[in-house]
């Protein structure tokens, strides 16, 4: 299976980098994982910034037409680990076994961007810093593969 995480910015704090690298190494056993980092537009009027960043995402997504796209959005449906297991299992069993998770820009997506996707969910109803969101997502993906493979998860 191939999983890509499309996100804005780079991990810049050692503790985030260490945590991410730990889960990244663990996941190699189960999945081909790639991180795609985009440079976020931060200057200008809020709606214009949202549009520019969303357009940048849409342009980048053209390279991944055969991937199932999953948009992470704080205002979307809250999911559990079990829900994520089903999303990944379904993709493993019935689709191309390619998933692209999208972690949006800090100011959020444009309305038109969000409206163009049906597969959206939230990891939490609290706002997470982007770097922490990336860690939570990769940890949950790792947990999912431990569950799918009936392996014990060591906390």
From Swiss-Prot:
This is Ribosomal RNA large subunit methyltransferase H. InterPro entries: Alpha/beta_knot_MTases, RlmH-like, tRNA_m1G_MTases_N. It is an enzyme of class 2 (transferase). It comes from Mycoplasma mycoides subsp. mycoides SC (strain CCUG 32753 / NCTC 10114 / PG1). The gene is rlmH. SUPFAM superfamilies: alpha/beta knot. Belongs to the RNA methyltransferase RlmH family. Specifically methylates the pseudouridine at position 1915 (m3Psi1915) in 23S rRNA. GO terms for molecular function: rRNA (pseudouridine-N3-)-methyltransferase activity. Signal peptide: none annotated. Gene3D superfamilies: 3.40.1280.10. Its EC number is 2.1.1.177. It is found in: Cytoplasm. One of its GO terms (cellular component) is cytoplasm. It catalyses: pseudouridine(1915) in 23S rRNA + S-adenosyl-L-methionine = N(3)-methylpseudouridine(1915) in 23S rRNA + S-adenosyl-L-homocysteine + H(+). CDD domains: RlmH-like (cd18081). It comes from the Bacteria. Homodimer. Keywords: Cytoplasm, Methyltransferase, rRNA processing, S-adenosyl-L-methionine, Transferase. S-adenosyl-L-methionine binds at residues 72, 104, 123-128.
């Amino acid at each position: 299976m191939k999983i890509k995480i499309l996100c804005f910015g780079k991990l810049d704090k050692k503790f985030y980098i260490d945590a991410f690298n730990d889960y990244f190494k663990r996941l190699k056993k189960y999945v081909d994982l790639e991180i795609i980092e985009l440079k976020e537009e931060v200057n200008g009027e809020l709606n214009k910034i949202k549009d520019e960043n969303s357009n940048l995402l849409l342009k980048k997504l053209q390279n991944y037409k055969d991937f199932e796209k999953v948009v992470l959005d704080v205002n979307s449906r809250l999911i559990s680990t079990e829900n994520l297991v089903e999303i990944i299992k379904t993709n493993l069993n019935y689709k191309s076994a390619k998933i692209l998770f999208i972690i949006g820009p800090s100011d959020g997506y444009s309305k038109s961007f969000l409206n163009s996707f049906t597969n959206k969910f939230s990891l939490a109803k609290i706002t997470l810093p982007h770097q922490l969101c990336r860690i939570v997502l990769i940890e949950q993906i790792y947990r999912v593969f431990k569950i799918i493979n009936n392996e014990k998860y060591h906390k």
